[in-house]
Amino acid sequence: MSLQFQNDCGDSVKQAIIEELQNLLSSDTGVLQQTEKRIKQLEYTEGYGVYLSEIIMNQAHELPLRQIAIVMLTRYVENHWTDDDDVKRKANGCMASEQAKRTIRNILPNGLYDPNSKIRSSVAHTISTIAATDYPHCWAELFDIIVKCLGGNEDSIHGAMQVLQDFSYDVEQIKELGPVVIPEVYRIFDSEQNYSIKTRVSAIRILKPLFASIAALITNKEEQSTMMSSILTNFMDKLMHYLSMNSGAVSSFLLRTEIIKVFTHLVNEMPKYINPFMDRVLPIVWQLLTQIAETYVKVSVNQTETSPLASGDSEEDDEQTNFQSLIIQILEFINCILTCNKLRGSIKNVLADLIYITIVYIQLSEEQLEDWHDDPEKFVDDEDDGGVELTVRMCGRDVLLAINDEFGANAIQPLQEALGRHFSVADAEKAANNPNWWKIQEACMDAVHAFRDVILAGDSTFDLLNYLTIVRNLLVHQESPPLVGRALWTLSIYSKSDLYNPQMLTEILDVTLCSLSPEKSHILRISAVRTLNGFLQANETIDGEKRTLLVSKLPGFLDGIMALVPGSKAAVLALLMEALTFMVKFDAEFAFASQAKITPLAIAVFLKYTEDPYVLETVQDLIKALCQRKECLGPLQEKFIPTIVSILGLTGAASTEKQDIALDVLNTIVRYTEPPLNNSLLETAFPAIINCVLHTDDHAVMVAGGECLRSFINVSPEQICSYKNGEGINCIMQVVATVLLNPMNSEMTAAGQIGRLVITIITKMGSMLGQNVDMLLKAVISKMQNLECLKVIMNLVLIFAHLFLTQMDAVLNFLSTVPGPNGEPAMQFVLTNWLSRQNSFFGNYERKVTTMALCKLFEYGVATQDNRLTTITFKELVDDPTDTRRRTRSVAATTQKWVTIPALVKIFKVLISEYQHFQEGKSDEPLTDSEEDGDDEDAPGNPDKPRYISDLFESDEDNAEDEQLLQELLKETNYQGDIADNLQKFLTTFTQNEHFPTFYEHLTEGERLILLSKVQQK
């Protein structure tokens, strides 16, 4: 250690750090809180990081103490190593001195030789964190240290490999380090006599991040190809060699799994480089998959043989785990090939064999069956979404889904071939009295489900009648509940088909109803509920005899479901709520006749599961379905509103758990209520909301209250305004202006749909508000101060966007005469917050409205040269073209500078970017590396996937309302139809404007390219 840190004071500080580290290991919350405060103070000590490094290296200390020391050192490095970030500098104050940094950099590499793998891995991560800012200019010797470690013992090799896995390369480093590191990695991997499996595995793990860096950083295709070819030419032969070796001491499942992971990465990210090797890789992988299938069935599926695989203390030492991981990785590899246009053709001719072997792997294992018998929740979770654990069965299902997605109807004939072979085997096993004969039948039905859409479309050659006959004949095997349950559910999925006559349908429904009996296995009872859901979903639009028959059975199913409720937990209850929702939606008369049973159950589940969002969502759906039945709405309000009002009146700790949920439920009820509002809503629920929101300190309650009030205003604004002789407006203003928009409150009070709420108030109650409009908008501006949450900023900006579209002159006057928080015109303040974030806004409605508003504002400003707009400026951070220094993280902040431009120029730049966003949203997804060299002409291709954050919001329940609002806005503007087309016309027209040259000179090269090549070529 450096002499400057060695003194009595230093020893006492070091001892204090050790004591606080020991306190951090305490389970006492109070001790932990006090320790965190003292640690914060110790971080300002000059030698803090150095002392931590020494503690880490001292093997005399207990392992937990050393581990917590590494955690604290990494945090210290992240917060105190550089001061490029102004926010970080203000938050963390003192930065590490250069002397302390040098000392830490000298000490840490010793940890790469530590005999404990956890210490090595953690030290390696900290070294990588430091290297991200210090290598190479402040730590040039790091690479020599790593190379030395690679030539050392197995501990140091593992440590060096961990550093390389976490390392962040730049272009120069990948070119300099690659040629040195790769030969070392190859040497270690190929030295099976000298190094353990674990060490060789750590060498293989370097390849994925290295390939990813080459793909991202080496943009010259020829240079990239040369580098990749030189690596793969050496490596691929050895990778295939060790993958194909017979199982034994020198070839573990762990090593094979890592090899397959490398292949999978190449298929996913760089398929053209693995393509030349696929003719050799695929037979090896196929042989491996088929060879281990027999062992998997005997050991895992049926447990007819004791596992020959050794268990271990750690996951990497457990061969049983590694065996399953290998199967999962092979299936993922195949899945990636199926979704890669360039490589998919390589398995097109073996689809029947692939489907056949995949069905083998999706059989139910004995372990999973035991879990299902012990825990109904596990059964529901696994069958609904595959559960949270990645299993062989789940991965096999994914392969079948990929075959369906990519080959469509072309996969049906291979599917039938595979099914025929399996059905023959199952019949033989059944004849031989094999107790597990049914598992392959259940797996076959599971497999066919992946192709259900193609089969139901009727465009394939699938023999549905024969298949349904086979499935129907399985219903007699009540001794196998999972088989019968799967058969029932399968029959429900295809029940829309004309193949179902009344007799057949009655028989299946009766078996399903019987399966709900209390004496049946819970697997069968739950399967019966899923079957009912399947029938109702498949036939929701059907009329005639089928519907009549289904409706006649609903009371019996309701009794069966109600009998299943006692003792059921979250996942099962959610399924039951879902079934009741389908039933209510299916028939209005049944809904009215049954609401006396269903509504109390919904209330009970709501009260019991307030902290389970999934169960609550299903309850909300059920309430929504009841609300949409006019006959049920009155009784529902009568029973539910007193409960909700009671919850809203709670005080203290008991209130916070349920009030936001109660407000959500009330919001659902109000939303589907037709005007006028009845007394229970207006005289009881409405004041309860106001009182609750005004007296809570829970942000979630405030937000939910705001949403609920928006529904009240939407349904009957006149009643709200006239409530108690005008007190309704005061109540609304009090909640919105003094609670939700109060700048003294957390920004999260506006985290809901505050923008829509304010817009609703102005549009629905505008003529009755008077001076309250100005007060409302001033509150919006005040709330915009010092915000960090993008959603909140976006919601507040949305208010002004809406007003620019509907009341341009009025809002310009307001923003030009009202001062912003810092004394500048409010227009300057609003546009600064808006324009700096527009390209990050999400949500289809929000993005379109704000873009349309900017178009209108820009057109108005250019046409009128109104000084209320032309005097507004915008500060923008741009790259300094005169700075030619090599870019690293530590110097990146100094290569940019601030420039001031007119706000109208910034609006123009933003609109160019928005055009690109909407245009790309319209077009197909850009070709990836896997697609650029041609597609399979006969493949259906990948289904559309979300491309932007906004796409993830498409299922939001506000969509219908959003679309209505959007259409109303479009009527008030000149923008009709597709927004991308409108932007294209707008930008093209502006290029002919006399002011265009002035704006053009402010554009970057990228913006000019978009404008001139993409817009004008249209």
Swiss-Prot record:
Record-level GO BP terms: proteasome localization; protein import into nucleus
InterPro entries reported in the protein's UniProt record: ARM-like, ARM-type_fold, HEAT_IPO9_central, Importin-beta_N
Annotated localization: Cytoplasm; Nucleus
Biased composition (Acidic residues): 926-939
Reported phenotype of the disruption mutant: Male and female sterility caused by disruption of chromosome segregation and condensation during meiosis. Impaired nuclear localization of proteasome components. Males form abnormally structured sperm and fail to properly exchange histones for protamines.
Gene3D superfamilies in alphabetical order: Leucine-rich Repeat Variant (1.25.10.10)
GO MF terms, alphabetically ordered: nuclear import signal receptor activity; small GTPase binding
GO CC terms in record: cytosol; nucleoplasm
Pfam families to which the protein is assigned, alphabetical: HEAT_IPO9_c, IBN_N
Domain Importin N-terminal, first and last residues per copy: 35-114
Keywords: Cytoplasm, Nucleus, Protein transport, Transport
Region (Disordered): 921-950
Known role: Nuclear transport receptor that mediates nuclear import of proteins. Serves as receptor for nuclear localization signals (NLS) in cargo substrates. Is thought to mediate docking of the importin/substrate complex to the nuclear pore complex (NPC) through binding to nucleoporin and the complex is subsequently translocated through the pore by an energy requiring, Ran-dependent mechanism. Mediates the import of pre-assembled proteasomes into the nucleus during the late stages of sperm development.
Family: Belongs to the importin beta family.
Name the record gives this protein: Importin-9
